[in-house]
Amino acid sequence: MSLQGKVALVTGASRGIGQAIALELGRLGAVVIGTATSASGAEKIAETLKANGVEGAGLVLDVSSDESVAATLEHIQQHLGQPLIVVNNAGITRDNLLVRMKDDEWFDVVNTNLNSLYRLSKAVLRGMTKARWGRIINIGSVVGAMGNAGQTNYAAAKAGLEGFTRALAREVGSRAITVNAVAPGFIDTDMTRELPEAQREALLGQIPLGRLGQAEEIAKVVGFLASDGAAYVTGATVPVNGGMYMS
């Protein structure tokens, strides 16, 4: 599996799953652009890529802004080339029970986690169509399929992500562009490490494999979907959740 010569764009790449994806695509030979919402985050991405021998850059991108998406893509195209692999990973949470949820908690999550797919995917399709090759990979969540109390906004956005993935896959398949999603379960991150022991044990009790996933395990699936080995896979949502949810 080689991505040599391909330019890959990974949003939300300063830590966790996004960082692991950026490093995996770089390991496979891609030139990687990772984005963050702040200059310090973009600098961290650039340093991480360099430290791991990956060619690429860290850039500031607000996926909720049409202007930011347009400016960032123009910069990438001018300096690094057309991104033919795009990983929509950036996302936020604003958890609350629906009865208490404020409008901005709903709309911020939907705008960042779902509307951003529309903005970024639409913006890169022309270049992929011209190249007659492309990979769009959307990072969803097990919550999009099974739901989670206090996360109606997040669950709705992630469920929408899966529908978007399937519909777009049907639109662009004839151009050798594949569109897939990866739906992680609970992953070992700073947030899950801070859970109280009792809560952590209860969580592990729901997972047949009896452990949290690693960000690198998500990244390996993304690396496969980005490769020519997955050229006949499109419109799929790949669950990586340790068996927590089976469909």
UniProtKB/Swiss-Prot annotation:
Transmembrane segments: none
Pathway info: Lipid metabolism; fatty acid biosynthesis
Reactions accelerated catalytically: a (3R)-hydroxyacyl-[ACP] + NADP(+) = a 3-oxoacyl-[ACP] + NADPH + H(+)
Enzyme class: oxidoreductase
One Pfam match: adh_short_C2
The protein's Enzyme Commission number: 1.1.1.100
Recorded GO MF terms: 3-oxoacyl-[acyl-carrier-protein] reductase (NADPH) activity; NAD binding; NADP binding; oxidoreductase activity, acting on the CH-OH group of donors, NAD or NADP as acceptor
Positions annotated as active site in the UniProt record: Y154
Gene this protein is translated from: fabG
Protein name, UniProt field: 3-oxoacyl-[acyl-carrier-protein] reductase FabG
Assembly: Homotetramer.
GO BP annotations, alphabetical order: fatty acid elongation
Binding site for substrate: S141
The protein's role, per its UniProt record: Catalyzes the NADPH-dependent reduction of beta-ketoacyl-ACP substrates to beta-hydroxyacyl-ACP products, the first reductive step in the elongation cycle of fatty acid biosynthesis.
Protein keywords: Fatty acid biosynthesis, Fatty acid metabolism, Lipid biosynthesis, Lipid metabolism, NADP, Oxidoreductase
Similarity comment: Belongs to the short-chain dehydrogenases/reductases (SDR) family.
Residues annotated to bind NADP(+): G12, A13, S14, R15, T37, D62, V63, N89, Y154, A155, A156, A157, K158, I187
